[in-house]
């Protein structure tokens, strides 16, 4: 495990290494668990926290890979989401963070999810409260998570209908 509070800092202290602190004001979150990683991404959607991506004094520099802008098709619907370049939405996405080149097909529904780069969500698939890893394909009609559950689901491999 590589958790700062549970592993790295105690090991450094046991090894007699020097540790230094830096007082930081603003948003910070340890994302060492699935739940905290999901929460940090959902914080992007919450305008009432210290994480303000619209602040012109707090620039975020990233590698800008040439790609098409995101596209919401005629059957697509997006509510309260962050959408990265190259994403194509023909289904319905709500309260989610969609990374680059995500593809959500027609009649698919995504809610409170974090879809990492290159995720493909098949026609009629449903995703609830999940983190879907880079490059994963969710097959047509597959269901991930439950709208009635508080549990965060981590998907790191292809999901077929009925799994």
Annotate each language-model stretch with its function.
Residues 1-163:
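Left-handed beta-helix
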């Amino acid at each position: 495990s590589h958790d700062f509070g549970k592993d790295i800092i105690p090991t450094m202290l046991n090894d007699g290494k020097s540790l230094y602190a830096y007082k930081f004001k603003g948003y910070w979150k340890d994302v060492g668990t699935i739940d905290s990683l999901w929460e940090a991404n959902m914080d992007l959607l919450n305008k009432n926290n210290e994480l303000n991506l619209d602040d012109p004094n707090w620039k975020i520099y990233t590698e800008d890979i040439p790609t098409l802008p995101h596209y919401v098709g005629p059957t697509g619907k997006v509510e309260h989401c962050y959408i990265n370049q190259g994403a194509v939405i023909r289904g319905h996405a709500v309260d989610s963070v969609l990374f680059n080149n995500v593809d959500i097909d027609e009649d698919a529904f995504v809610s409170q999810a974090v879809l990492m780069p290159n995720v493909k969500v098949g026609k009629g698939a449903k995703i609830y409260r999940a983190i879907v890893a880079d490059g994963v394909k969710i097959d047509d009609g597959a269901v991930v998570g439950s709208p009635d559950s508080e549990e965060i689901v981590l998907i790191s491999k292809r999901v077929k209908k009925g799994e």
